[in-house]
């Protein structure tokens, strides 16, 4: 970058100098013309010192006593001396007169100087283009020559630094063996995949895993982003691809990592896509096809939008191995926390198992941030060790934001928040299929006035209709509490309504849990464009019915346990934060509730209809088998769309 800026500055300086010289010469060579009568008057008054004739006596350059100059045209066929005599100017007042060619710059010379100036400007621009590429004018410089690898031995990361991804490491272990000892595979005629596509949510460690792969294989590591290839000028991206692969072959064995490959690997033929994207993608395909049998270069790409990639990228011989880097389970989260806690002084009361249980649905990047935030909190308080309280506070800050102690509610608003969060907690604690409540707080964090942390006992990939229905009721527990206690609702339920709308819509349009809409799926999200108006109306009405039924369930639970609601709310007003164990002591055993679920009356009666749970459910009787291969896509969709492990944040 410094070299680029220096060259651009020198070019701009040279251009400015040439322009100034050209302007100066032009101004000097072409004095401002004046009227002949005015010149004769100035000569009579003695203000003219010399006159230079030009153009065969048809023009004259007049120099004044103050050294200023003007240009005057002379009448054809008349000499300057005749004009002076006819004007009655005494000879002693005549200035020095020089014939043509003795001092004035000719028009031809002036034209030549202008042409030379234009040529010089063109040369400067040409040199800039040749030196720095076409993108050095008006955009950023090309990256040609800037693809520098991380060589073996530099900042080594190995599989020991990647925790919680044992299955993924097994998938890429043969690539490590191939890069270390390619002859063993060649003797057997084995062909190692040239491309590996890592897919999964952001923050799951795809980049870290690739660096560890290079470290284990002792290979050079090239890391680029898909957006780095594309520029305004057509052909720049393709040239960068060629340069990248050329350098990788020179530094073999090597691994090329292309992050966010969907930036250049989108399906071709779209109207809004420019030819620059197509040329860049074509060049990547050509380079991967051009690998020789003895080339020890492997391309690893990462994306979380595999559905939009061009099919040519995914065919055998290119990115023919696809590895899913999914969210870590509880055991993996425990291992990830241990890795990030290395070298940090932890207090004896730190319980990483408890923290792993509370962080369901978090990625490796989220967990690293929790550990780092806890270290910052300990340093801020000038303590020598990181305590368990630091970790729990860091978790709250990561999920809900820092506590806003300066934000003070009025006493009425504080009561509204307390009853709102108590409503969530009571409903979630009593319903048989809702997840357990870990924490309830009315401490303002971020934009939330309070929050209820509802985290499952175990990692879940599948959701039943009963679980989703109770989830809806728990989400609407805060709004129901406001209605019962204050007779009105507030804007604090906006986040709850967003979540209930998304879940109810998915239940009807994606998971076949509706009564009238049937076993149909409209795809991701709530897209109703592909449906007829009647079907879209039916889907909307059925989703609305699910929400209304869940709302009624929440009201019934809170009416039957009004004393529990009051106890929890008053305790929140006293201490502001309640954990799950204390919450269990505040809520009495469940009573027989008039729970109405009209949507289930039209369905077959479940054989294992569970009663309202006694106390806090441990979850062992509700575990769902995970060895169901035919529902893998449903499992991923459920995890991505519901994210039930995230705490419920209520903006009150």
Curated annotation (Swiss-Prot):
What's the EC number here? 3.4.24.-
Positions in the Cytoplasmic compartment:
1-6, 130-652
Question: Cross-referenced PROSITE patterns, in alphabetical order?
Answer: AAA
**Cofactor binding note from Swiss-Prot or TrEMBL:** Binds 1 zinc ion per subunit.
CC cofactor = Zn(2+)
Extracellular compartment ranges equal: 28-108
SMART domains recorded for this chain? AAA
Bilayer topology term = Multi-pass membrane protein
Provide the protein's localization: Cell membrane
Keyword annotations: ATP-binding, Cell membrane, Hydrolase, Membrane, Metal-binding, Metalloprotease, Nucleotide-binding, Protease, Transmembrane, Transmembrane helix, Zinc
**For binding ATP, which residues are annotated in this chain's numbering?**
200-207
- What is a GO molecular function of this protein? ATP-dependent peptidase activity
Q: Matching Gene3D superfamilies, A to Z?
A: 1.10.8.60, P-loop containing nucleotide triphosphate hydrolases, Peptidase M41
Q: Where does Zn(2+) bind?
A: 420, 424, 496
Q: What does this protein do?
A: Acts as a processive, ATP-dependent zinc metallopeptidase for both cytoplasmic and membrane proteins. Plays a role in the quality control of integral membrane proteins.
Which PANTHER family does the record cross-reference, listed alphabetically? ATP-DEPENDENT ZINC METALLOPROTEASE YME1L1, METALLOPROTEASE M41 FTSH
Subunit details: Homohexamer.
Name the record gives this protein: ATP-dependent zinc metalloprotease FtsH 2
Organism listed in the record: Sphaerobacter thermophilus (strain ATCC 49802 / DSM 20745 / KCCM 41009 / NCIMB 13125 / S 6022)
């Amino acid at each position: 970058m410094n070299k680029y800026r220096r060259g651009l500055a020198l070019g701009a300086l040279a251009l400015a100098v040439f322009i100034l010289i050209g302007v100066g010469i032009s101004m000097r060579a072409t004095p401002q013309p004046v009227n002949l009568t005015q010149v004769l008057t100035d000569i009579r008054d003695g203000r003219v010192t010399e006159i230079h004739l030009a153009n065969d006596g048809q023009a004259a350059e007049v120099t004044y006593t103050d050294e200023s100059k003007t240009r005057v045209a002379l009448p054809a066929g008349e000499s300057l001396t005749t004009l002076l005599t006819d004007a009655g100017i005494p000879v002693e007042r005549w200035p020095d007169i020089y014939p043509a060619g003795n001092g004035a710059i000719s028009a031809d010379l002036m034209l030549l100087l202008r042409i030379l100036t234009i040529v010089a400007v063109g040369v400067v621009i040409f040199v800039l283009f040749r030196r720095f590429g076409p993108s050095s004018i008006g955009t950023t410089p090309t990256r040609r020559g800037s693809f520098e690898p991380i060589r073996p031995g530099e900042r080594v990361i190995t599989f020991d630094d990647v925790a919680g991804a044992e299955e993924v490491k097994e998938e890429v272990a043969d690539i490590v063996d191939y890069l270390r000892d390619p002859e063993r595979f060649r003797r057997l005629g084995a062909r190692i995949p040239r491309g590996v596509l890592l897919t999964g949510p952001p923050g799951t460690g795809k980049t870290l895993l690739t660096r560890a792969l290079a470290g284990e294989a002792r290979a050079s590591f090239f890391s680029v982003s898909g957006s780095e290839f594309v520029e305004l000028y057509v052909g720049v991206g393709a040239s960068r691809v060629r340069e990248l692969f050329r350098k990788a072959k020179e530094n073999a064995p090597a691994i090329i990592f292309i992050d966010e490959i969907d930036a250049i690997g989108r399906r071709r033929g779209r109207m809004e896509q420019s030819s620059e994207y197509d040329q860049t993608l074509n060049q990547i395909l050509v380079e991967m096809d051009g690998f020789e049998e003895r080339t020890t270069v492997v391309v690893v790409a990462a994306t979380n939008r595999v559905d939009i990639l061009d099919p040519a990228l995914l065919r055998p011989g290119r990115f023919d191995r696809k590895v899913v880097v999914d969210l870590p389970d509880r055991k993996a989260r425990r291992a990830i926390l241990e890795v990030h806690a290395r070298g940090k002084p932890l207090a004896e009361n730190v319980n990483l198992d408890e923290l792993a249980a509370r962080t369901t649905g978090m990625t490796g990047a989220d967990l690293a941030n929790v550990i780092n935030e806890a270290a910052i909190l300990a340093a801020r308080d000038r303590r020598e060790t990181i305590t368990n309280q630091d970790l729990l506070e860091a978790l709250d800050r990561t999920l809900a934001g820092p506590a806003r102690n300066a934000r003070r509610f009025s006493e009425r608003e504080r009561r509204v928040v307390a009853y709102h969060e108590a409503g969530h907690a009571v409903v979630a604690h009593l319903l048989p299929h809702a997840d357990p409540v870990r924490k309830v707080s009315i401490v303002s964090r971020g934009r939330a006035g309070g929050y209820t942390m509802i985290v499952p006992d175990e990692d879940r990939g599948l959701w039943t209709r009963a679980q989703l229905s109770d989830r809806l009721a728990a989400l609407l527990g805060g709004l129901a509490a406001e209605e019962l206690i204050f007779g009105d609702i507030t804007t604090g339920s906006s986040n709850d309504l967003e979540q209930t709308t998304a879940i109810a819509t998915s239940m009807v349009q994606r998971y076949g849990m509706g009564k009238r809409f049937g076993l149909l799926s409209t795809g991701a999200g709530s897209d109703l464009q592909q449906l007829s108006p009647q079907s879209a109306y039916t889907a909307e009405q059925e989703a609305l019915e699910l929400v209304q039924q869940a709302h009624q369930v929440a009201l019934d639970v809170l009416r039957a346990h009004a004393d529990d609601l009051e106890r929890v709310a008053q305790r929140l007003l006293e201490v502001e934060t309640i954990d799950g164990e204390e919450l269990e002591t505040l809520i009495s055993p469940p009573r027989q509730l008039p729970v109405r679920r009209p949507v289930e009356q039209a369905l077959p009666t479940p054989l294992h209809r569970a009663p309202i749970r006694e106390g806090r459910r441990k979850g062992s009787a509700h575990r769902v088998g995970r060895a169901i291969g035919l529902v893998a896509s449903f499992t991923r969709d459920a995890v991505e769309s519901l994210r039930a492990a995230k705490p419920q944040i209520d903006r009150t």
